[in-house]
Amino acid sequence: MTQPLFLIGPRGCGKTTVGMALADSLNRRFVDTDQWLQSQLNMTVAEIVEREEWAGFRARETAALEAVTAASTVIATGGGIILTEFNRHFMQNNGIVVYLCAPVSVLVNRLQAAPEEDLRPTLTGKPLSEEVQEVLEERDALYREVAHIIIDATNEPSQVISEIRSALAQTINC
């Protein structure tokens, strides 16, 4: 199987952490769309949003998704990538989409433990726990709609990777 694997889910679900280790275990290339975009523009996500607002960032995010999609690649996407209908169809039609699902409490704890998350612009201007709750309520149905595989991401990364590999084996052998 050489199809790209798209990891989707909210901030803090482990897309980058799991993605790097999953790519290594599958002997694949790893790309994070936010990191790729930041390196191309030499700007942080917050700087891009400040300069181009969210609409401009979302357009660049779509271009990044198309640019990094390649065979034998694990792609960690931005949490809002599913907000654009084109992106949802693109991922569904060009690879296997894995939703890393976790409850609000886990996401908030992870985000509070990661100081680099302070570099991310707020989506709602609300306190973190309220923002995560609101954003997840808005996006969960979209994550589920686009996903070929849904994985409980509350476990340790090694367990999440094992579950993804098992689900991939079942998907391929159907």
Curated annotation (Swiss-Prot):
Residues where Mg(2+) binds: T16, D32
Identify the EC number(s): 2.7.1.71
A GO BP term here is: aromatic amino acid family biosynthetic process
Q: Which branch of life, at top level?
A: Bacteria
Keyword list, A-Z:
Amino-acid biosynthesis, Aromatic amino acid biosynthesis, ATP-binding, Cytoplasm, Kinase, Magnesium, Metal-binding, Nucleotide-binding, Transferase
Query: Which Pfam families does the entry link to?
Result: SKI
Q: Which residues bind substrate?
A: D34, R58, G79, R139
Q: Which GO terms describe its cellular component?
A: cytosol
- In this UniProt entry, which cysteines form S-S bonds? none
Which InterPro entries has this protein been placed in? P-loop_NTPase, Shikimate/glucono_kinase, Shikimate_kinase/TSH1, Shikimate_kinase_2, Shikimate_kinase_CS
| Protein localization | Cytoplasm
The pathway is: Metabolic intermediate biosynthesis; chorismate biosynthesis; chorismate from D-erythrose 4-phosphate and phosphoenolpyruvate: step 5/7
Region LID domain, residue ranges: 112-126
One MF term in the entry's GO annotations: shikimate kinase activity
For the ligand (ATP), the binding residues are: G12, C13, G14, K15, T16, T17, R120
Known catalytic reactions: shikimate + ATP = 3-phosphoshikimate + ADP + H(+)
Q: Which cofactor does it need?
A: Mg(2+)
Domain comment as written in the entry: The LID domain closes over the active site upon ATP binding.
Q: PANTHER family attached here? A: SHIKIMATE KINASE, SHIKIMATE KINASE 2
- Subunit details: Monomer.
Q: Which family does it belong to?
A: Belongs to the shikimate kinase family. AroL subfamily.
Q: What does this protein do?
A: Catalyzes the specific phosphorylation of the 3-hydroxyl group of shikimic acid using ATP as a cosubstrate.
Q: What is this protein called?
A: Shikimate kinase 2
Q: Can you name the source organism?
A: Shigella flexneri
Q: What is the lineage of its organism?
A: Bacteria, Pseudomonadati, Pseudomonadota, Gammaproteobacteria, Enterobacterales
Q: What's the encoding gene here?
A: aroL
